[in-house]
Amino acid sequence: MSVLLETSLGDIVIDLLVDESPKACENFLKLCKVKYYNFSPVHSVQKNFTFQTGDPLGPDSPESDGGSSIWGLLEGPVKRTFSLKLSPKLKHTERGTVSMATVPSSHDPDERLAASQFIVTLEDNLDYLDGKAAIFGKVVEGFDVLEKINGAFIDDQGRPLKDIRIRHTVILDDPYDDPPGLVVPAESPLPSKAQLATVRIADDEELDDNMDEEAMEKLRREREARAQALTLEMVGDLPFAEVKPPENVLFVCKLNPVTQDEDLQLIFSRFGPILSCEVIRDKRTGDSLQYAFIEFENQKDCEQAYFKMQGVLIDDHRIHVDFSQSVSKLSESWRNATISKRSQRGGFGGVAELEKKRQYRATDNVREQDAYGMVFDKGEARRRPVSRERRYSRSPKRSSRRDSRSPKRGLHRNRYRDRSDSRSPRREDSYRDRNRERSYNDERRDRRDDDRYRERRRR
């Protein structure tokens, strides 16, 4: 009966002593079967002595209860520990001896209680553990892993600085029947939040012990620059993250404000043909910003100008020359080329499979002067000529209803319009008199208010 432990440092195969310690073997096998040990840390390493594991959270977690037996998982916290009888025949004489970590019972000091944690010896003849730990197995494969664990860097409490964890457990042979209520997971469960919170240095993180602080700082800056370049690529400021500035462009600064493009080109043209020379100016005022970009035809000419023109006096100003770090022109040309390519592809947004959404009610698109075809397309409505003539529905039911209207309806409408237009002259005269009387009363009221105001001022 054997169990394979897949750790972050390698595989360990354990043969179980079923006849000598049946209860401890059953507990260990069933805990492995329900994947209880997955992601459990090796939380204690004592060099040339033992290492201890089996608590899924480890002592660093405030939620840890020290582990539980399989019966505690199935029946509750009352059965979290179980009693073990230590066999006097089993001794810790060989390296790789596997035993359950035990504590004395509070009721009987001679009784030993165990849960899920177990110990693996890293040295021979450790008789100190006899009578304190219950042996139930031996390591038969993976002694190189034991050497790696023995040489791990640890803190003052014996905990590895870099995590050593059990990743998986595989049962090679199980002679025991499953207890009632035991559910075997279909796949290995993911680590819980409490387990992830105990990670110090991840077991898959690579560390270079020979790297000095300066090299590590340089590596950190390179990673940060790469991340920033990737961010600029994502927002569209760079055509791609690995873009480099052109090597045939010089950056010239500390220029005199009166220096012109032609003057600068004439001075630098002695090193070779110049494709462009531009003094950067303010867009609003046109004043020189006192720096320029000079693009040479050849890279060698650009390098020669860099070495020869550093600190040269131009128009009473000593200039500073450096290689251009700008990729703005590159980005602009890349954007223009990309946009033109997309426009030639057809479709919508440069994707031939896409089509602009048409918002319409009618399904047929043959009608030429359809006033209500587009629901929200205001641009189409503005471009469409306005027609004053009234349009009627093409539905046969509505057209027949319109034709079958009563002729009296139009007659009543015309009669009302004629009645409103032909008022009697007497009524119109009465309206005029009423308006005159209202205006006269308003004038009297205003005069009365003015007189009252004057009397108050006199008092």
UniProtKB/Swiss-Prot annotation:
Its EC number is 5.2.1.8. Residues 1-171 form the PPIase cyclophilin-type domain. It comes from the Eukaryota. Its main location: nucleus. It is an enzyme of class 5 (isomerase). Gene3D superfamilies: 3.30.70.330, Cyclophilin-like. It catalyses: [protein]-peptidylproline (omega=180) = [protein]-peptidylproline (omega=0). InterPro entries: CRIP, Cyclophilin-like_dom_sf, Cyclophilin-type_PPIase_dom, Cyclophilin_PPIL4, Nucleotide-bd_a/b_plait_sf, RBD_domain_sf, RRM_dom. Residues 377-392, 417-459 have a biased composition (Basic and acidic residues). The keyword Repressor does not apply. One of its GO terms (cellular component) is nucleus. Residues 248-326 form the RRM domain. Keywords: Isomerase, Nucleus, RNA-binding, Rotamase. Residues 407-416 have a biased composition (Basic residues). One of its GO terms (molecular function) is RNA binding. It is found in: Nucleus. Residues 376-459 are annotated as: Disordered. Belongs to the cyclophilin-type PPIase family. PPIL4 subfamily. PPIases accelerate the folding of proteins. It catalyzes the cis-trans isomerization of proline imidic peptide bonds in oligopeptides. This is Peptidyl-prolyl cis-trans isomerase-like 4.
